[in-house]
Amino acid sequence: MNAYEWIQSVVLFAVLLLAIKPMGSFMAKIFQGDRTFLSRLLVPCESFIYRVCGIDKDEEMGWQQYAWALLLFNLICGVALFFILLLQGVLPLNPQKFPAFSWHLALNTAVSFMTNTNWQNYGGESTASYFTQTFGFAVHNFLSAATGIVVAIATIRGFVRRRVSKIGNFYVDIARCTLYLLLPVSLVFAVFLVSQGVIQNFSGYRTVPLVQATSYLKPKLDATGNALKDPKGNSITETIQVKEVTIPMGPVASQEAIKELGTNGGGFFNANSAHPYENPTPLANVVEVFLMLLIGGSLTYTFGVMAGNTRQGWAILAVMLAILVTAVGTLYWAETSGNPLVAKLGVHGVNMEGKETRFGVAGTSLFTSAATGTSCGAVNAMHDSMTPIGGMIPLSLILLSEVVVGGVGTGLYTMIAFVVISVFIAGLMIGRTPELLGKKIEVREMWMSIITVLTSGILVLIFSGLALVVPSAVSSMANPGAHGLSEVLYAFASMSNNNGSAFAGLNGNTIFYNVTGAIAMFLGRFAPIVASLAMAGSLAQKKFIPASLGTLPTDKIPFALWLTLVILIVGALTFFPALSLGPIVEHLIMLGGK
């Protein structure tokens, strides 16, 4: 790295660490019902919402009631978005006259935004109207993020509370999360992004002539959207000449802020955060990385504050950041090492294919690692154009169940599941009943943790295997061999883990991928949520056990190292065979010069 790249990285993580404590403390106040500096302004709004919706803010729920309320709320929101997409053609704020989504694309997209995945089998600027973007996607960016956060808070309450059956009120939690946390922070950073050049308007698209006409080759597609191929298996192309270009407009800044803050990731434009209207400057790029990591990282401190042991929160954060920094460094090394196949053609240097020159390799490595370590899934470069090892880094971060730092809320409750598993295994090794924060870890907690951790892995392997044998799914693959396998594996890893990023080269807008993807996203989101809430309900009913000489300290460096090892071992045992057939084989082929 040069001096600028070092400064960029160091300043980012330094500012993040400085923000963890105040933001974590602020969130603890929000969810403990304490007054904050926003209370004077927002309490009337909060009370109005409760009054209109008939919510008793003092009535709490058991874990089953909390889970049912969460599922019902999200299903209603998802169905509403589904019909917005089906009726897009007749709804207002559609200056480009975009037609309705097909039923299977509407299903996939509605589930995608409902589950905080933001997987997009469409191009935003060529498919979605301003009404859809604003009242459909942007609204769900807030609500899906809030859903993940409140599940993490409910899980924390399971450790904090003693001999009770209640873990909070879902409706109160999601209202306070949206009002006091997501809306104010998004507003501040939306204004900042506008200052950097991100657009915010409802104007129609603008068509302007090019100074010089250009042409490019475009693959021909059949009626189903799949690439046509000649008898030798090569794609059939046609030459397209371009004399003018249409510049899309739209309310981008307001959606961009919550897209990163809520680790949603769905781009207003097809190019996502590589587009200059979403991410125009290197400073905006670093700030967007900061937003991705802010809430997920700060929730670890919230955990420590609410549990009465802030060192526990710092220990979990240290594990998250250690893996993240390692991923950033490995990705940077892989991309700066270049491609030996290209070097043979006389093109030496770093691999800049698919990257924006305003960000460079360092800015791309930071953004890519943060977006896949969290559940954000935003991209500022083409992941498919990275070297095999470079592409394996974001894939591996997703496959680790996104605990680095993880999505807002999802990262923490998944990491807590890993902590429970680590404590349980360590307890078996030393012959002690496992304990965590004064609560016994027994069979029920272990089962719920296993469901939380392994659900996504099971979905990835089942659906990836299915996609490699179903003819209609195989026809969606534009690349054969190891790279084609990597693309399929990445797609279902991204959907099952609610990430949303993708490798190119795979036509996902088919009935097979839209329907199976919707199933993977739904189960990958809500099975771990229900399991985490069930664990919280079980823990809340247990008595507190004071620490003794035989208690395993979980806030010290040895346990942090043990937790890191468990996370990596679970990921390796689950996915190493698949990675061996995909990016690892592809890397060996590249080194072999083939």
UniProtKB/Swiss-Prot annotation:
Q: Which residues form a coiled coil?
A: none
Where does the UniProt annotation locate this protein?
Cell inner membrane
Q: Which residues cross the membrane?
A: 11-31, 67-87, 136-156, 179-199, 286-306, 314-334, 411-431, 450-470, 517-537, 559-579
The Gene Ontology terms for molecular function here are:
P-type potassium transmembrane transporter activity; potassium ion binding
Record's function text: Part of the high-affinity ATP-driven potassium transport (or Kdp) system, which catalyzes the hydrolysis of ATP coupled with the electrogenic transport of potassium into the cytoplasm. This subunit binds the periplasmic potassium ions and delivers the ions to the membrane domain of KdpB through an intramembrane tunnel.
Q: Name one GO cellular component term.
A: plasma membrane
Could you tell me which Pfam families the record lists for this protein?
KdpA
What the entry lists under NCBIfam families is as follows: kdpA
Main localization (coarse): membrane
State the species of origin. Answer: Citrifermentans bemidjiense (strain ATCC BAA-1014 / DSM 16622 / JCM 12645 / Bem)
- Subunit architecture: The system is composed of three essential subunits: KdpA, KdpB and KdpC.
The family classification in the record reads:
Belongs to the KdpA family.
Tell me yes or no: is Lyase among this UniProt entry's keywords.
no
Q: Which InterPro entries match?
A: KdpA
What UniProt keywords are attached to this protein's entry? Cell inner membrane, Cell membrane, Ion transport, Membrane, Potassium, Potassium transport, Transmembrane, Transmembrane helix, Transport
This protein's name: Potassium-transporting ATPase potassium-binding subunit
Report how it sits in the membrane.
Answer: Multi-pass membrane protein
